[in-house]
Structures are given as C-alpha cells and as structure tokens.
C-alpha cells in the first residue's frame, strides 16, 4: 500500500490524533515523503477546539508546533478521501465503519499497523490521556512516536 492521504482518528481530536498527526508530518518530511497528506479527526470531537496544553507541550518539546490545530469531527467525506485510516483504540473501529462501512479494508489500529505477522502486542490501544497528569501524556507520546515511526518506515519501503 502506498497511501497519499492518511487520516488519524481518536475521540476528541485534541490529544492522541493531534500528537500522531504532528509526529507523522514531521517524520514524513524528514524521510522525503512530502507527497503524503496527513489529517486528523475525532469520533466525538467538538469542532474548533484547540489541543490540550499538555498535548501542545509534548509536541513543542519534540520541536513540533500544533497551536494552529483545531479539532474536527469525523465525517464520511473524510473517510472516503483517505487511503489509510489509523485509529487510536479498538472502540474507534466501529465508529469509522458506522460512518463508512466500505472503509473496513483501509482502517487499522495505529499501534498494530506495520507489525510483522505474529509480532506480539501487549495492548493494541493507545489510552486517552485527557484529564490525566503530564506524565501520562509523555507515555502516550512515546507510544504514538513508536507506532508512527513504524508506519513511516513502512511507507518509505512502499515508495521505493
């Protein structure tokens, strides 16, 4: 698969998918894969909300500015326009498929996408840090970074 448009999905589009979008855009640029567009949305997002301060902070510390981001609520049009949809937890899968049943083949968990067959995963979900201490955001960021690195590596191989 060589996607041109990736959609990252969480619940509120203010923490996890924002981190994943910022990291993925940054890593894709570094890898010279600028032709890939990365967007994010939330299954229950309040449109126009800014990322949490904690999200902005962990991204800022990684050299990524997300202050311009505004939350978007997931729509069937967003799903139809994406080549690859990566969700943060298993509960997001039926939310995507309810809006667009034909998206099943292109919708995956971020944390397990690109793993080798049989590679073990302790928890396929990336827990929502909203309302939790900064340390929880930092752990969430590290989990997302590891998963995004794997996705970007798989895209780099696919584009060669």
What residues fall within each predicted segment?
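Short polar/charged helix/loop
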Residues: 1-160
């Amino acid at each position: 698969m060589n996607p041109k448009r990736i959609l990252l999905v969480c619940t509120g589009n203010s923490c996890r998918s924002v981190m994943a979008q910022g990291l993925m855009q940054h890593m894709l640029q570094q890898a010279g894969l600028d032709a890939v567009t990365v967007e994010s949305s939330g299954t229950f997002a309040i449109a126009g909300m800014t990322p949490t301060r904690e999200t902005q902070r962990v991204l800022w510390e990684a050299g990524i500015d997300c202050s311009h981001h505004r939350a978007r609520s997931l729509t069937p049009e967003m799903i139809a326009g994406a080549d690859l949809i990566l969700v943060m937890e298993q509960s997001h899968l039926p939310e995507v498929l309810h809006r667009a049943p034909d998206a099943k083949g292109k919708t995956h968990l971020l944390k397990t996408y690109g793993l080798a067959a049989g590679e073990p995963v302790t928890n396929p979900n990336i827990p929502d840090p909203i309302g939790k201490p900064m340390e929880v955001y930092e752990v969430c960021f590290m989990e997302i970074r590891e998963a995004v690195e794997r996705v970007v590596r798989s895209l780099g191989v696919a584009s060669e």
